[in-house]
Amino acid sequence: MQNTLRCVLLSLLLSFSLSLNRVCLNPEGNEVDWYAIFLYPQNSSKEGILSYGYFDASSTSLKYYAYTEETFPPNRVTKYTLSPDTDYNFFFWNDDKTCKDDTESKSASSSKAHAKGELIMDKDNGVFLQHSLPRFPTRMKNGEILTELPGNAGIYGQTFLCISVETQTSYEIAELLNYINVSNNLSVTKDRVNPTENEWIRKLIDNKYSSKYPLTKETVIKSKDGKDFTFFSKSHRQKDVPYDTTLRQKYGTSFFVRTWSRPSLSPMICEDKQLLNVLDVAFDNKKFTYGKDKEHSKWAVSASGNICCFGDLNHTDSQKNRGGHIVCFENENLAKEMRGAIVTSDLCPNKFLAFME
């Protein structure tokens, strides 16, 4: 009887814990309003250990961790998403094929968004996770979803942005995901979705895309604690990537941009407000150092001011035909860390470096 009661109490505590965890979690498992992660190539340091830099709402500088499956924050999101608790909805998208052992699994059509992420919500809270890592999370042919990073995770640099939101805000994000036309790789099972659920969630699950939108959208999304995140969204019909024009016009400053560089980066822009490609980076006092050929992340930082951006899109001409988001927000300390990581970048002839504005 005592053992039975103990099991019942444990189950209740577990259910209560899971119901609270529809928010971003840091490496220690504590709730945070948002976080940004830079995952470094495994060969970028002498030790050759897969590592990452972590920054959240309470940080004053990047904190560095060696990767472990149990504590890596994005793994925590996937793990509690796939827990037995059914009082929530979830949706995973990835433009790259996610099925590890299925040769018929294909990458998304070019009309689909170049985007990767997860959206999870219960009746009160939600989590938006945007990332750059192909085949994460990985789905096996038998339907099993792996919660650890795939084997390709240590080859290139990657980025992750997690935002804790209220459930109503997650519906706004779902509309934006429909707008950019994300690829439904890992679908919610429909018996988990209430028939009266929000229409944008239903459209995502059913892979129904509406083209009745403007070519671009600018939307301010508030985190659970009220921080503003500006989503710059583009349809695949808009033949301009937000890095080139939108960011510089919106914030009135030059920008550095760091993305996947293949087949080649789009040219730098040497107008009054410049756009410069970042070529080499170094983090943690040059412990992690690597060039553009080892980069798959998508981030940008203002040359002056405190604007930090994480995106779906690369600064390459091929991305002009793809939908996606660039998410920007203000944080002085993170902006300093991002600018401080830049070792070399494009240089406009006869102009001062952009960060000297």
For the regions a language model picked out, list residue spans one by one:
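PLD/PLD-like phosphodiesterase catalytic module centered on the HKD motif
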Residues: 2-357
